[in-house]
Curated annotation (Swiss-Prot):
Database matches in PANTHER family: FORMATE DEHYDROGENASE 1 (PTHR42938:SF9)
Pathway: Cofactor biosynthesis; pyridoxine 5'-phosphate biosynthesis; pyridoxine 5'-phosphate from D-erythrose 4-phosphate: step 2/5
Organism for this UniProt entry: Pseudomonas paraeruginosa (strain DSM 24068 / PA7) (Pseudomonas aeruginosa (strain PA7))
Binding site for substrate: S45, T66, Y258
Protein name: Erythronate-4-phosphate dehydrogenase
Key words, A-Z: Cytoplasm, NAD, Oxidoreductase, Pyridoxine biosynthesis
Binding site for NAD(+): Q126, V127, D146, T175, A206, S207, R208, D232, G257
Gene: pdxB
Length: 380
């Protein structure tokens, strides 16, 4: 097999070395010419895999190390008989850790008690669904809007988007980018909806940039709106709006899901799908390649404050403020320089582990145990 992989996909050799020749390119450089002699294509969300790129090529399998598939022309895949796989849920936990880090940063700035807020989660799939479980496990009030899931689960606890926007103090977006269809999400938060947000609302977008109208949001913030914003995704990536970023409390270069586990899990999942397509046995597993965590464990005193424990556990694995600082330093120079810097920050992103790898002892204190379980850490 002739395999072409995005150069930023980790451990391609570990999983695919015995399957043929492997060539690597930057994801944005993968085009029609690059696919002329390729059987298997492995990509991330930065590569548009379209009819124009694939027509006439020998590509028979496409794997994307992402949850979303809006960069894949699935209609053409079906027409051309091209097998494909995404990696649903691969980086979901990393995104949840990112959102928790943003909430802690916002609470610190606002002097707010996270337990007293009402949370609105828009999109309850792989990422949003996990976030809802964590927030409710902590005993916090959560409203959920997910029309497609509500149609499948008519007895579920769902609310309309209008009610969520009217009642939630914190809004976290986790929808795919759908430009058409029954439930389009492009500019789901458009100018009228953004303007109608309650004063003091916190908005987090770690889904797709165009789910929020970036220009409308910038105008709103420039006008002095009482709104705290954390953005990890941007319209027109890798070109992020520096004026919008300057008005966000947290601004990062699409790295919410960039945990080490998430990256390796994505490669492992498309390898599993590839093996199923080929009808061959898997020779490598995620556990074979996942290194030990840097932090072996934490011992909490039974008398410690649960809110302090929550913040300590979350920040033990991730604090978005370091990524925010690095991103802001990159927002200088001309457009080409900023675009290159955006991709460079993602390419050279340092290792980050997930909270699920933390082993935490609580001395048997029930409230601390509840916090540890809700976060998904390992209780010992």
């Amino acid at each position: 097999m002739r395999i072409l992989a995005d150069e930023n996909i980790p451990l391609v050799d570990a999983f695919f070395a015995d399957q043929g020749s492997i060539r690597r390119l930057p994801g944005r450089a993968i085009d029609r010419a690059a696919l002329a002699e390729v059987d298997v294509l492995l990509v991330r969300s930065v590569t548009e895999v379209s009819r124009a790129a694939l027509a006439g090529s020998p590509v028979r399998f496409v794997g994307t190390c992402t949850i979303g598939t809006d960069h894949l022309d699935l209609d053409y895949f079906a027409e051309a008989g091209i097998a494909w796989s995404s990696a649903p849920g691969c980086n979901a936990r990393g995104v949840v850790d990112y959102v928790l880090g943003c909430l802690l940063a916002m609470a610190e700035v606002r002097g707010a008690d996270l337990a007293e807020r009402t949370y609105g989660v828009v999109g309850a799939g792989q990422v949003g669904g996990r976030l809802v479980e964590v927030l409710r496990g902590l005993g916090w009030k959560v409203l959920v809007c997910d029309p497609p899931r509500q149609a499948r689960e008519p007895d579920g606890e769902f609310v309309s988007l209008e009610r969520l926007l009217a009642e939630a103090d914190v809004i976290s977006l986790h929808t795919p980018l759908n430009r058409d269809g029954e439930h389009p999400t492009r500019h789901l938060l458009d100018e009228p909806r953004l303007a109608a947000l309650r004063p003091g609302t916190w908005l987090v977008n770690a889904s797709r940039g165009a789910v929020v109208d970036n220009q409308a949001l910038r105008r709103l913030l420039e006008g002095g709106a009482d709104l705290e914003v954390a953005l990890d995704v941007w319209e027109g990536e890798p070109q992020a709006d520096p004026e919008l970023a300057a008005r966000c409390l947290i601004a990062t270069p699409h790295i919410a899901g960039y945990s080490l586990e998430g990256k390796l899990r994505g490669t492992a999942q498309i390898y599993q799908a590839y093996c199923a397509w080929r009808g061959i046995a898997e020779r490598v597993s995620l556990q074979d390649v996942l290194p030990e965590t840097w932090l072996a464990g934490l011992q909490l005193n039974p008398g410690c404050d649960p809110a302090w424990a929550l913040a300590t556990l979350c920040r033990a694995v991730y604090d978005p403020r370091s990524d925010d600082a690095a991103f802001r330093r990159s927002l200088t120079g001309d457009s080409a320089t900023r675009r290159a810097a955006f991709d460079a920050l993602r390419k050279h992103y340092p290792p980050r582990r997930e909270i699920t790898g933390l082993r935490v002892a609580t001395g048997g204190q029930a409230e601390l145990q509840r916090v540890v379980r809700a976060l998904g850490a390992q209780l010992v």
